[in-house]
């Protein structure tokens, strides 16, 4: 997958109409080729809790060079929450420390998406 739109198009059919928040990671090899998708958290209508270790452990086990965080907002509102902003910062920082590059965090809502990279937040 070469862009955030590619991730959106892959994950959107699974996430856009759900009634609860789901957080996934897309794992990438050193050439940024898609390795695997893993669901790391299932939440409620308006919250989904995720800790950096839930992202990094699978990334390490699968020998991923990089990862993308993909989540849905069941409300359809693409505005990142304070929790979204904080976890993005923590994951980016943790990834740099252990050599797992965070390439983006996208939020899917309805038929659209928000990219932290495209909005200059990562």
Model-derived features with residue positions:
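Active-site-proximal loop/helix of nucleotide/amide-processing enzymes and allied scaffolds
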Residues: 6-9, 13, 27-31, 41-122
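Short glycine-rich loop/turn motifs
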Residues: 22-25
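Long, charged amphipathic helices and adjacent flexible linkers at domain junctions
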Residues: 1-5
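Short loop/turn motifs at secondary-structure junctions and domain boundaries
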Residues: 16-19
């Amino acid at each position: 997958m070469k862009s955030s739109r590619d991730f959106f198009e892959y994950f959107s059919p699974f996430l856009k109409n759900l009634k609860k928040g789901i957080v996934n990671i897309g794992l990438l090899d050193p050439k940024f080729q898609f390795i695997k998708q893993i669901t790391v958290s299932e939440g409620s209508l308006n919250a989904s809790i995720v800790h950096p270790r839930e992202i990094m452990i699978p990334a390490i086990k699968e020998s991923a060079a990089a990862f993308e965080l993909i989540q849905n907002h069941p409300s359809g509102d693409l505005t990142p929450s304070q929790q979204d902003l904080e976890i993005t910062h923590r994951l980016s920082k943790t990834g740099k420390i252990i050599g797992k590059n965070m390439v983006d965090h996208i939020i899917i809502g309805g038929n659209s998406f928000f990219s932290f990279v495209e909005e200059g937040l990562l």
